[in-house]
From Swiss-Prot:
This is Histidine--tRNA ligase. It comes from the Bacteria. Coiled coil: none annotated. NCBIfam families: hisS. CDD domains: HisRS-like_core, HisRS_anticodon. Homodimer. One of its GO terms (biological process) is histidyl-tRNA aminoacylation. Its main location: cytoplasm. SUPFAM superfamilies: Class II aaRS ABD-related (SSF52954), Class II aaRS and biotin synthetases (SSF55681). It is an enzyme of class 6 (ligase). It catalyses: tRNA(His) + L-histidine + ATP = L-histidyl-tRNA(His) + AMP + diphosphate + H(+). Keywords: Aminoacyl-tRNA synthetase, ATP-binding, Cytoplasm, Ligase, Nucleotide-binding, Protein biosynthesis.
Length: 424
């Protein structure tokens, strides 16, 4: 007997019971995006490897340790996308969407990182990302955060997430801060773990993000990034904070929030939660005003964020059990008798024409009434439409409300109107 082939570790199947809740959550997210005027862009999952090295940074964990990179038959180095921003910027440059234009874009799909699988963190994971190009003021940063807050309210999780903000300033301000931070870390090198020692010279701001408690205690005495900000970045950040306060969105300034990718500047933010056991990031982003030019385009201001859908689904299920998947079926068409199946299928097609958007399933595979009604219950149907030989003969159907048990004989021409009333 042949050995079963299993899914790759950290790359999961999502079965029908799971995808139903995903679809409802994704539908909620997309409705909010539409209400803000954002447009979908669809991007390849494979890009040239240099795109990510230039965008994310050669000495980041993503590029050094986590990318799925391979050589194709032409000898080109290709990578499964570890994030979406770089590909979105590449597409914008390639298709002339960015220079002197305003774009509000979103995308959704799988990303890939070779890291240790754990709850809410997988090697193939799904993100929804938003990217805005051509706007440089703090008002668009605030709009993106307000958009995410509207998501949390719609999903019933607003009380379970907290907004953390920071400004990491301009490239020049970060260079000055980097020098001061490295000088401080060199004085306390014996207190650093091996990972922080490695990062100290390659990407010292990432030391601020260390999860080591001893390093975090040391950093209490380190220079503060906020003391090195340029005046424009200070004004930008103050403007953002004022807009959020006016919108009633609470936030915490976290001066150690730097994000893990090199392309950010000025605003960075994260929505975090403690409702999944340990603190976890649900959604994160910031400004990346230099990335378009860095990837070969004309200088264009930009800001965006990405949200991990696996972690969002876990959070919704943990704190809002009333947020359930929509039923697979609204109406189940029961047919019994030797000559009723073709009539039942014809009636089903007519009802689909007259009731667009309603989910109707026709019984197949035979079975008596008891078995067919059991199938209707299994699929979550609210209403059954019943056709027997006598109903076919006299042009009627029985419509049964499966919640109340009430049933009515209705002329087939009137079934759609009757169902419309029952389903509301």
């Amino acid at each position: 007997m042949a050995k079963n082939i299993q899914a790759i570790r950290g790359m999961n199947d999502y079965l029908p019971g799971e995808t139903a809740i995903w679809q409802r959550i994704e539908g909620t997210l997309k409705n909010v995006l539409g209400s803000y005027g954002y447009s979908e862009i669809r991007l390849p999952i494979v890009e040239q490897t240099p795109l990510f090295k230039r965008a994310i940074g050669e000495v980041t964990d993503v590029v050094e340790k986590e990318m799925y990179t391979f050589e194709d038959r032409n000898g080109d180095s290709l990578t499964l996308r570890p994030e979406g921003t770089a590909g979105c910027v590449r597409a914008g440059i390639e298709h002339g969407l960015l220079y002197n234009q305003e774009q509000r874009l979103w995308y959704i799909g799988p990303m890939f990182r070779h890291e240790r699988p754990q709850k809410g963190r997988y090697r193939q994971f799904h993100q929804l990302g938003c990217e805005v190009f051509g706007l440089q003021g703090p008002d668009i940063d605030a709009e993106l955060i307000m958009l995410t807050a509207r998501w949390w309210r719609a999903l019933g999780i607003f009380e379970h997430v907290t907004l953390e903000l920071n400004s990491i300033g301009s490239l020049e301000a970060r260079a000055n801060y980097r020098d001061a931070l490295v000088a401080f870390l060199e004085q306390h090198k014996e207190k650093l773990d091996e990972d922080c020692k490695r990062r100290m010279y390659t990407n010292p701001l990432r030391v601020l993000d260390s999860k080591n408690p001893e390093v975090q205690a040391l950093l209490n005495d380190a220079p503060a990034l906020g003391d090195y900000l340029d005046e424009e970045s200070r004004e930008h950040f103050a403007g953002l904070c004022k807009l959020l306060e006016s919108a009633g969105i609470a936030y915490t300034v976290n001066q150690r929030l730097v994000r893990g990718l090199d392309y950010y500047n000025r605003t960075v933010f994260e929505w975090v939660t403690n409702s999944l056991g340990s603190q976890g990031t649900v959604c994160a982003g910031g400004r990346y005003d230099g990335l378009v030019e860095q990837l070969g385009g004309r200088a264009t201001p930009a800001v965006g964020f990405a949200m991990g859908l696996e972690r969002l689904v876990l959070l919704v299920q943990a704190v809002n059990p009333e947020f359930k998947a929509d039923p697979v079926v609204d109406i189940y068409l029961v047919a019994s008798g030797a000559d009723t199946q073709s009539a039942a299928m014809a009636l089903a097609e007519r009802l689909r024409d007259e009731l667009p958007g309603v989910k109707l399933m026709t019984n197949h595979g035979g079975g008596n009434f008891k078995k067919q009604f059991a199938r209707a219950d299994k699929w979550g149907a609210r209403v059954a439409v019943v056709l027997g030989e006598s109903e076919v003969a006299n042009g009627t159907a029985v419509v049964k409300d499966l919640r109340s048990g009430e049933q009515t004989a209705v002329a087939q021409d009137s079934v759609a109107a009757h169902l419309r009333t029952l389903l509301g």
